[in-house]
Amino acid sequence: MISASSRSLPWRNLSVAFWLWLTFVIAVPIGAAQTKGGHGGAGAVQKLPETERALRANVQSGRLDDLRWPDFSDYRADVANFYRPSGYALTWIQGNAPTKRAREMVEILRRADAEGLNPEDYDGSRWVERFAHLESSHSPQGEARFDVALTVCVMRYISDVRIGRINPKHFQFGLDVEHKKLNLPSFLRELVSEQTGLEARLAEIEPPFAEYKATRQALLKYMELAKEDDGEKLPQPPGILFAGGLYEGISRIASRLRLIGDLPQDAVIPPDSKVYEGPLVDAVKRFQKRHGLTPNGYLTVDTVEQLNVPLASRVEQLRLTLERYRWLRYSFTQPPVVVNLPEYRLRAFDRDGQVGLAMNVNVGDAYDFQTPVFESGIRYLVFRPYWNVPPRILRNEVIPDTAEDRSYIVDNDMEVTTPDGQVVASGPISDSVLQQLRAGKLTVRQKPGPENALGLVKIIFPNEHHVYLHDTPESVDMFSQEHRALSHGCIHLQEPAELAAWLLKDKPEWNPERVERAMHEGRDNFTVNLTKPVPILIVYGTAVVEENGEVRFYRDIYGHDAALESALAKGYPYPK
């Protein structure tokens, strides 16, 4: 007979066996996951939260001390939006090592100087050590720091190539980069997911101008030339040195001009020569032409000063010019008119992107009347215009001169008017009228005619600065001077009739002959509206690459280069 106790034993043994089996089934995957550290197991759940927490903490702080410029608060929202869709998963790391895309991107960051940028802004020299540390440490915190560091550096690089490092509004320039800003999280996700064409994809966000690409090529050339610059200075001659004169620096000037390409390599200059002549004079003329100097071959103080500028400084001029190209809009509704202030030059572009018209200009005085940098649209022309004296000139010049000489206004073909244009006085000025002028109740304008300060035509593009293009009664010889920062802020045109005809070329009735008649024989203050506004850019670039590849350098007449260089030296976060 079987007892109750003996019958219960098989059940108890089965129960024990079942629980042992169940424990084994559950335990094996956990162990496997912990061993492999892969995706989808409890081990991954153990590891991913730690990495995720580290990523979140680094992003939320907006600061990463591993970076050369640790504060990335200006990019914090973009970085967070980049990681959020993936649940804060690592982007640049796979199997405890940088991904192929990470290595490709770092190589581009390390070569940022070819774009006129500073590789150290993107930790260029730090990535080799980071790669080695990442592959040896296997630390979740280290992986998170690496990943966030690369994300921040890549975002900075993309933004810098696209719109520049510093917002031009920081310098009170009227240029808008906001419309060009990229959706950085979206763009970067595309960049990471695409397996080919990284450099081509990045090239799509660069300024599309041929001038930008030419300037970048010139930068590469001058970076190499700067390596050969020994820094030795040319001696200043005792006075202006003409062809045939004696000069102790013949060997040095020949070496300098050969290096930068103005003196042919095969030009024969005796090593012990002390005579300034022949090929050297021709080379100096070429140099002068490229540096905004009168190309007469005279070795002047200004010429020697420009020859002594270190080539590293020329490299910096090219870099700053590339930065300013990034501030410009990338497309235009009509071919634009562009005025480059340091060059004293205007260019009007055709639909094919070629220069259709170019001329010299005079710009605002460097001390009191700097012409501002901004963009607008030319809307109309006024032939034989009045000159409405700007408040500043009225206050600082016309009123004091009138107080000393009550005939000043009539002698200068001016008249006093009410704000709505009603003439109050055009003869000697009374005390009452002078008092109203001082109080701002009356204003002054100059009558139309060849002696008018605006000449015979003005070209209007609305702006807060009261700046426009116009003719001038001054001698045409002034447009061949080296220094042409001479105006009260407006831009004087060397060939005003040609620009007027160019702007009106879509109006068949306004041929060049009619433009000339309107200027010299037409009605006073006659307005002609353009069919469509023509974009105009007033820009500032001290390095210019011509269509033939010739590189030209100009003086920093307003100190804008110095201001930009100083601001860039401060590092991130740059003013946005």
For the regions a protein language model found, what residue spans apply to each?
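Mature extracellular/secreted ectodomains of secretory-pathway proteins
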Residues: 115-179
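Serine/threonine-rich, low-complexity intrinsically disordered segments
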Residues: 4, 25-28, 32
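Well-ordered beta-sheet/strand-loop patches within structured domains
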Residues: 32-78, 82-84, 148, 152-156, ...
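Bacterial N-terminal signal peptides
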Residues: 15-27
